[in-house]
Regions:
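Basic, polyanion-binding surface patches
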Residues: 1-107
Length: 107
């Protein structure tokens, strides 16, 4: 994936739990669209969390952490992240889930 070098270079990140109306964001970051990694970060409204990492506006939760290890397994990279902050919203909307190659609403 084109995002791998960005993750490896930065090491600090924010994992965003998206709501079911944010499927377009998930598709961009999954590489299902023609946007480059740089364009993916320009496409949506972001704000900086308390640790300085980018958070997706409207996401249900933000998990901030640092990559502590990574493994290449087959055709995938697996990143192990030490989470140091979890913030969630009070939004009462379903979460977005990717399961069996499809996006689903987790209501």
């Amino acid at each position: 994936s084109a995002i791998i070098p960005i993750l490896q270079g930065n090491r600090d990140l924010c994992i965003n739990t998206l709501n079911d109306s944010q499927q377009d964001i998930a598709e961009h970051f999954a590489g299902l669209t023609d946007l480059s990694p740089e364009e993916r970060f320009e496409y949506h409204i972001w704000h900086r969390g308390q640790t300085g990492q980018l958070e997706v506006e409207g996401a249900l939760a933000h998990l901030h952490g640092s990559i502590v290890d990574q493994r290449e397994i087959g055709t995938h990279y697996v990143f192990f992240v030490q989470i140091n902050e979890i913030r969630n919203t009070d939004a009462q909307v379903p979460a977005l889930l990717y399961f069996r190659r499809q996006f689903k609403s987790l209501a």
